[in-house]
Amino acid sequence: MKKKYSCLFSLLSILFISACNKQLREEPHSILTPEFFATTQGFQRGLDAAYAGTRNLWGTQNLFTMTVIGTDEFYTGKDGNNDINKYNSNYNTSNGTVAAIWKECYTNINTCNGVIEYAPKITGLPDEQKGRNVAEAKFLRANFYFLLVQFWGDVTLNRNFQTAPVTSATRTPLAEVYMTLLSRT
């Protein structure tokens, strides 16, 4: 009897595991879609999201950690990140601190790009408020890029709102990144 149940359980397990052969396709990829930015509330909430992104950078101490690695001001804490005190050069994208800064900056840059790009399409808001929100989004975008270039020099420059995952990137020369940040566009 035990052998029957064991065989039946194994057979059912195999059927359940092999029953789903479709790949999961996430639609939409983010709640920040063009339709979201096209509304007055979405326009303001997009800017709020960009501001909230600064908390994810500074609040987790990732930026602080990256600026003092290799100095005598930073010691291994309870998290056991021994690479910091051993002066190892193991800081690449597989390191959580590095990956988190990179991801957060580009996520927030894309949010700022959405606010900037879809501002002209917003109706029902005074031009003065739209202009102020766009100026704030441009400042935040420039700040996120400034953080990126301080750590990595040449970085990918995204000037438009990305609605789908991007699987390739080209590094933009540092001088061009700075010129873009200083321009009014």
Model-identified regions with their sequence ranges:
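Short, well-structured active-site flanking segments
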Residues: 24, 149-160
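Conserved, well-structured interaction surfaces
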Residues: 39-40, 44-48, 52-56, 79-152, ...
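Core domains of carbohydrate- and sulfate-ester-processing enzymes
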Residues: 71-77
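Bacterial Sec-dependent N-terminal signal peptides
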Residues: 1-32
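Short clusters of hydrophobic/aromatic residues that line enzyme substrate/ligand-binding pockets
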Residues: 24, 36-37, 69, 84-91, ...
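Outer-membrane beta-barrel and related beta-rich outer-membrane complex signature
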Residues: 62-69, 154-158
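Membrane-proximal, proline-rich intrinsically disordered regions
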Residues: 20-67
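Short linear capping/connector segments at secondary-structure termini
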Residues: 29-33, 89-92, 159-166
